[in-house]
Each structure stands twice: as structure tokens, then as C-alpha cells.
Curated annotation (Swiss-Prot):
Record protein name field: Glycine cleavage system H protein
Biological processes annotated in GO: glycine decarboxylation via glycine cleavage system
CDD domains (UniProt xref): GCS_H
Family membership: Belongs to the GcvH family.
Lineage: Bacteria, Bacillati, Cyanobacteriota, Cyanophyceae, Oscillatoriophycideae
Function description: The glycine cleavage system catalyzes the degradation of glycine. The H protein shuttles the methylamine group of glycine from the P protein to the T protein.
Domain called Lipoyl-binding: residue spans: 24-106
HAMAP family, alphabetized: GcvH
Entry keywords, A to Z: Lipoyl
Cofactor binding comment, as recorded: Binds 1 lipoyl cofactor covalently.
Cofactor(s) needed: (R)-lipoate
Cellular component aspect of the GO annotation: cytosol; glycine cleavage complex
Signal sequence bounds: none
Native source organism of the sequence: Trichodesmium erythraeum (strain IMS101)
Length: 131
């Protein structure tokens, strides 16, 4: 997989990404995180209507290498989850930014994306190249 980091996204240091469209955030996992995890075998996501809190776990992802918490890059209410990836884990590695998104969240405070713990594509690339 080519490690791409689209410029229209924001990234967290726990390797989740956010694509904003008005007050709706599409949340997923970066190509870097998926590459590090290897083959995904299980994903647990919150239900529609659940609240998620920035920097708090909202689900888990299990691979052949590890089990990791998914941490919320924003605070808000889940309005949609990508049911397809629960059964078709390969969508995460094939297309993490379009087909492999995890959640759509109605964001409580969009200014959360302006903090020091949220990165542009260029800054995120520098972060992961240093790991």
C-alpha cells in the first residue's frame, strides 16, 4: 500500500483522520496506521446515536499483530458508521480514505481541530517519518 496522506484531511497523533464537511466529520484510520497493523481481523465501532469524546477510545481494531484502541479526534454524536468495513476489512487497506472510513460524526466543537494535537498532511507525514 502506498502511504498517502490527502491534504484535505486533518490527522491525530493516534493516527485517526478527520474530513470535515460543514459540521459533519468523517473519521477513519490513516494509511500509515493500517500499514503498521497489518491484516485486520476485527473492528468494533460505536452505534449510531452514541457520543464520542475527543482523545477517548471509541472502538477497537484488531490485527494479526495487535489490538489497538481507536481514539476520537473530535467530540460529537455518531450519525453513521461504515457497516461495510465490519465484514470487509480489506477496504481499510485498499482505500482507507474513501471506502474505508469508520464513522460520520456531528461535531460538537469544530475548533477542536485547531489544537496542537491535530496535524496537517505535511506535519503528519513528518510525524510518521520520525517513528
Amino acid at each position: 500500500m502506498t502511504l498517502e496522506f490527502p491534504d484535505d484531511l486533518k490527522y491525530s497523533d493516534s493516527h485517526e483522520y478527520v474530513r470535515m464537511d460543514g459540521e459533519i466529520a468523517t473519521v477513519g484510520i490513516s494509511a500509515y496506521a493500517i500499514d503498521q497493523l497489518g491484516d485486520i481481523v476485527f473492528i468494533e465501532l460505536p452505534e449510531v446515536g452514541d457520543s464520542i469524546e475527543k482523545e477517548e477510545p471509541f472502538g477497537t481494531i484488531e490485527s494479526v499483530k495487535a489490538v489497538e484502541d481507536l481514539k476520537a479526534p473530535v467530540t460529537g454524536t455518531v450519525i453513521e458508521r461504515n457497516e461495510d468495513i465490519l465484514d470487509e476489512h480489506e477496504k481499510l487497506s485498499e482505500d482507507p480514505y474513501i471506502e474505508g472510513w469508520l464513522l460520520k460524526v456531528r461535531v460538537k466543537d469544530p475548533d477542536e481541530l485547531n489544537g496542537d494535537d491535530i496535524y496537517s498532511a505535511d506535519d503528519y507525514r513528518k510525524l510518521v517519518e520520525g517513528e
